[in-house]
């Protein structure tokens, strides 16, 4: 369905009155946005002029005008609302929200890990808004993947709406494997094959490494869960227990540090977002494998379509059925104390509608947390995405960001291990001591 470039005055009036539900954008390059109807105008929204401040992950806005199109559509149906978009590096958003809430001037809508911000008391409960939404659209909750809904739920109350979902898979260079006469890591390849492949693929004389590494806690958590370990156990009702110093966790870090010491991968930097370094080195042919996300697959396919890209689920490990990848899901929430809750929730409903979710997947490789994702031919026909879809069924949510001090300590332990400052056991014991000083009891 193409964008309507010309709207008659009558249609425009109906649209502004909330009778029209297509909410088409002005941009001629956004004709795909016609996929899916927008929520109708909420007649209970006051016509009083307001400004809605929205904070988004910069990775979603840096190279796309999708959210600008969303704003144009929203302001057309709600002409009394002026939406201001602000983009920040994902890792900085939780602290910015905390400072804004404490200062009494929070933004109206924020993208982030809703489970964690809700647990820290930084988000408004939205059960009433969800209930009203379900009354007008009984399928409202049913459209979202259950694991993503769990990431916007705290103590049986919803604090946001899921936006996207992601996990880690193995991304590899098929040409490198063929040159080395190695079978592709498909099917039930195991951790020991992965290490052996990294060794064979490492060619110092060609400045090529077998594996890429990062110190980012979320990414390293995939190695921990793959080994059957965990860094935090418990629930909001019963309280949480920090388990950084588990022997299984130390074994996972030892496996990684041993490969780094053996020269099978470059020692990662300590800069924030060092996971971006691995992707660039992979594109440059300097590393043959790394654990990457779905957006990495999209970036490679869209910018270098002839790249010999291979994708596989994570390797099997001795942990067998208790092993998993890491699950990530961002959502949109309303910070504690925000003044325009009703309008903010309407904006959230629009942002998570299929009209924007579909092009978000097509253009950004940020896949919506919708049940149709794993069955839609448009995406399942991309064979490189099949391992990603399958891995979503075997991924564990990362919850350590509930406790920033503990998460920082875990990150420091990873760096200490990778830089041979301490053994994995020593580094994790120190992290356990530091992280244990934070509040881990039952949450309010």
Regions found by a protein language model. Name each.
Residues 33-42, 114-167, 192, 310-312, ...:
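Hinge/lid segment of periplasmic solute-binding proteins
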Residues 69, 73-143, 179-181, 281, ...:
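Extracytoplasmic "Venus flytrap"/periplasmic binding protein-like
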